[in-house]
């Protein structure tokens, strides 16, 4: 899978994780919370994207 992702600092990643946890404690499902925070991050980081590639074949080999 290849996708454009904003480059986040460790502090920004921590804030995102805390925001997800807050939304979940308010009754939102984990998937909904992650999607909402991802949308918020994308909206606030226009033009600061890096390309990230995930090689799923390596994951399959490591689990065997």
Curated annotation (Swiss-Prot):
Protein family membership: Belongs to the UPF0181 family.
UniProt xrefs under NCBIfam families: PRK05114.1
Name used for this protein in its record: UPF0181 protein NT01EI_1861
């Amino acid at each position: 899978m290849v996708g454009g992702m904003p480059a986040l600092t460790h502090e920004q990643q921590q804030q995102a994780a805390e925001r997800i946890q807050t939304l979940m404690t308010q009754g939102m499902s984990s998937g909904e919370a992650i999607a909402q925070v991802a949308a918020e991050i994308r909206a606030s980081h226009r033009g600061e994207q890096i390309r990230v590639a995930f090689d799923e074949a390596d994951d399959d080999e490591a689990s065997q």
